[in-house]
Amino acid sequence: MKKMKKVLAVALSLVMAGSLAACGSSSTETKAPETGASETVAESTAESGSEAASEVSTDGKVYNIGICQLIQHDALDAATKGFEDALTEVFGDNVKFDEQNAQGDSATCATIINGFVSNNDDLILANATAALQAAAAGTDTIPILGTSGTDYGVALDIDNFDGTVGGNISGTADLAPLDGQADMLHELFPDAKKIGLLYCSAEANSKFQVDTIKGYLEKLGYTCEYYAFSDSNDLSSVCTSAANDSDVIYVPTDNTVANNTEIVNNICTPAGVPVVAGEEGICKGCGVATLSISYYDLGVATGKMAAKVLQGEDISTMPIEYAPTFTKEYVASRCEAYGITVPDDYVALEE
């Protein structure tokens, strides 16, 4: 792989200038993750909340929903949009959204949540792990639904998490099958030796993912090395180290990387180091392939859960829901430049 990087340097520069020919495409779906709590609680989002979607509010009440989104990037934006669309379908004009973005700052999440609590909102959507943690700390009475977080047990420090948080919290998780992601990496890069695990140490969900996939990758014969950065300020230097010492880099569903994919792309592409991503937004920005969920659909599932809660269902008994299907996706121009042969069951991402 190291020798290949030099040979590919010229070809890869074309990726920076524009898109090359596609590698071929078709669709595939993968079953929900079979790790941790998801074994017992994974449900189809098509079935989840379907009854709520067919019910229309007739009591005339206007529901006020506070939305705390950690940061602005494609995945979280899509989850918020799906959530709002699902609730609007049920309640029409009788639901109002106070959508606020914390710009990646956990302390700002807490400030936003405190505002929702002061307003006595009817329900809070916490989009991403830091937002969920702030909401859990901010109120034990207002219903909280999380989304775009990976593992609620890790995020909320719950021992022996069984899939149901209890109290005033439930939601959806974006956990992809990490064993499937490892298998996908091996399918595309069977001759690679060293895998760099690039992630933000401040994001509990990212740490969980790299720890988990490391075990799967090592079983496939790879040597793995952690490359943790504390925030966007040291992403460039850490990513450079990873690119210098890795054959392939893996990035989980990391919010900091998702908001700074250009940094990763501008380092890894000239270095000739392909990036396998945990979700499609990161993949579009800097990756070659991903096994990803639809964040819009995840948001819709969360919105259907919210409708049930607002119509009287007990949130304390509602298990965390997971995406039922996952799609192998690839970026055609980068795969072409790297000379990657993409199997027919991958779907080309729009560039």
Regions found by a protein language model. Name each.
Residues 3-26:
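Sec-dependent N-terminal signal peptides of Gram-positive bacterial secreted proteins and lipoproteins
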